[in-house]
Amino acid sequence: MPANNTLPLTILADLTDTQIAEAARASGEPEWLVERREAAWRFFAESLPPIWKRTDLTKFRSENIAVPLGPQGTAVQWDAKLSEQGVVFTTLAAALHDHEALVRQYLGAAIDPLGHKFNALHAALWQDGVFLYVPKNVAVELPLQAIFTLADGSHSTFPHNLIIAERGASVTFVEEFTSQDAEDQILAAPATEIFVGDNATVRFVSAQTWGKGVYHIGAQRARLGRDGTIEWIGLNLGGQLQHIEAEATLEGNGSRIDWVAATFADGTQSLLTAPMVRHIGTNAESHLNFKTVVDDSGYSTFDGMVKIDHSGQGTNSRLEEHAIHLSSASRSDSIPGLQIDANDVKAGHASTSGQIEEEQLFYMLSRGIKRDDAIHMIVTGFFEPVLDRIPLEDLRERAAVLVEAKI
């Protein structure tokens, strides 16, 4: 979904809530959304930056970022026959006009627009993004995909994806953020909200393959109803800096999440992923398995948490993160955590980090495999369980190429 640079750009430091409101009204947005944007901007302007211990924003000059006031352009391609079943897959801007009641009901119902300064910035300035609605008991067989790119000259992007699967529905949604390398700093602040109805199933793939120079500060939230299931697949390979706060709330009894991700930080990349699962319903399950590779002076942080409320009796949860270091200068921090307020649960976490074992390399070298080839095989095999779950062959192959280029 390429950006359209015909829109006038405004430096973030010079922007006012009046300009934001005027641009929103000029785009035909309803007054309730205009008021939300104004409130979010005031919060952004008045609040201090969040204190993130492991995300260093000192080199990022957000005040110098130029932002477009209005949609940059979003194109959606899909099988129109799905509309006969009541499925809606369109731009979020179009959905505001055609399905305003649904958008108003769900927009901001998972992600708090005033959660912190960058959440508020997104809520004030979001443009582009898709709206996916699957009605009750409808199964969408083929994956639906949205690709967000940066055109030449773009300095920022704020897409918002809103995914709704009603009771008994099933769908696969794939989002990808990708671009060429940039000389200037680029701000990407996307957000994705997912609502999984009772007995519904969502497979969600999020691939971050930005080029150099991109600062990716994103939010992702999913809310699950009774017996709802989400398979969440994350891929974090690009950009200069990444800070993703991702959360799944298992509200319904018997709900389930299976969450895997692959992260590879090399060069001077700093990539942080902060997944959190909150168990509210009874007899819910969460299984998280994250894999990380760091090389050169790359830095990766896994800040994972499983919270089990007092109401979350019968929970079964497992949280794991495993990291491989390919250089002595690379670094990874793994911070898995459990917060348990229920007394009838099964929960555990595990974390490993280190260089490839010499015994493993020696075994491969003794069979005539060159050292570089052996390392390549180990890393690709390490990521394979994650990449194999990507449902689109094209994305799966491109991800494999990107991983190979980093080794």
Residue ranges, per PLM feature:
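N-terminal amphipathic, basic helical "cap/leader" segment at the start of enzyme domains
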Residues: 2-123, 135, 289
